[in-house]
């Protein structure tokens, strides 16, 4: 299983095989030179008529190395999982493959993102992609959010099932974050204007790589995405850059479950290049 998983991730995300055993680039993400920079229209998401993402909702006591949540799955990294240091996380990035969503009779939803904060506090600075099935029709779009501030759709950013997406959030200075989203298959990238990415409340305590069941008054049904693959999951914490499982900090997997303990989404163990997969189990 692990060999098959790594083969799929490395081939589909176009990651050199040597990165599995040799230290890879963990520098601050930038737009690839062969990408076309596109300016996308930033469209506010109406909170009263549209779902949104939400900070981590834990279930039961926190457990290490695997915690439980009713709306998140994936991985989190902090200086310390029980008492994380503020102002410690300055960057996060990852790549993932846009999943093929299976149609369902009811409306279902799925968000894939990277972000800073939200696991141990109530702010989140995040960017990612959304994949829903509404009235039996699959819809995908890119978005970002500075929770509890506004949520925004990134209109004009291309997304198709099978595309390889890269995303990053980097703290620059003076409460400003830089957010970059790239479609490596279609070779386009966009940078979110910094007028949208300021936060005076961000604690910068945690880095997260997440598959989420979005929220609108309550947690929404999780779309059947099959398996989501993420790789090159990197962070910079206390000035040290590395993959999720760097020894300079602590990390934990997160399994998404229902209130009755039924697994909804289970992440695999980490590969040495920060790769993991998440398998859908239940709405």
Where are these regions (language model features)?
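Sec/Tat signal peptide C-region and signal peptidase I cleavage site
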Residues: 19-23
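Bacterial N-terminal signal peptides that target proteins for export
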Residues: 2-9
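Bacterial N-terminal signal peptides
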Residues: 9-17
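Exposed, interaction-prone regions of secreted/extracellular proteins
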Residues: 24-283
């Amino acid at each position: 299983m692990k060999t098959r998983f790594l083969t799929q991730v490395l081939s589909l995300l176009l990651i050199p095989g040597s990165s599995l055993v040799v230290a890879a680039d963990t520098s601050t993400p930038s737009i690839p030179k062969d990408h076309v920079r596109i300016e996308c229209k930033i469209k506010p998401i109406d909170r009263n008529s549209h779902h949104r993402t939400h900070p981590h909702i834990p279930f039961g006591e926190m457990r290490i190395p695997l915690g439980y949540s009713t709306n998140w799955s994936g991985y989190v990294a902090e200086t310390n999982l029980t008492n994380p240091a503020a102002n410690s996380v300055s960057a996060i990035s990852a790549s993932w493959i846009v999943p093929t969503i299976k149609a369902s009779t009811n409306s279902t939803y799925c968000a894939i993102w990277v972000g800073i904060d939200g696991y141990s506090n109530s702010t989140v600075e995040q960017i990612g992609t959304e994949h829903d099935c509404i009235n039996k029709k699959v819809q995908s779009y890119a978005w970002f959010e500075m929770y509890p501030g506004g949520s925004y759709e990134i209109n004009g950013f291309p997304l198709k099932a099978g595309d390889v997406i890269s995303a990053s959030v980097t703290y620059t200075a003076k409460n400003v974050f830089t957010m970059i989203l790239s479609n490596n298959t279609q070779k386009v990238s966009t940078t979110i204007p910094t007028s949208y990415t300021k936060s005076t409340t961000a604690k910068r305590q945690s880095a997260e790589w997440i598959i989420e069941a979005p929220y609108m008054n309550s947690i929404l049904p999780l779309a059947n995405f099959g398996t989501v693959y993420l790789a090159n999951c990197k962070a910079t914490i206390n000035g040290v850059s590395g993959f999720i499982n760097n020894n300079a900090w602590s990390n934990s997997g997160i399994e998404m479950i229902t209130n009755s303990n039924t697994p909804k989404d289970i992440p695999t163990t980490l590969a040495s290049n920060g790769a993991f997969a998440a398998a859908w189990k239940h709405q």
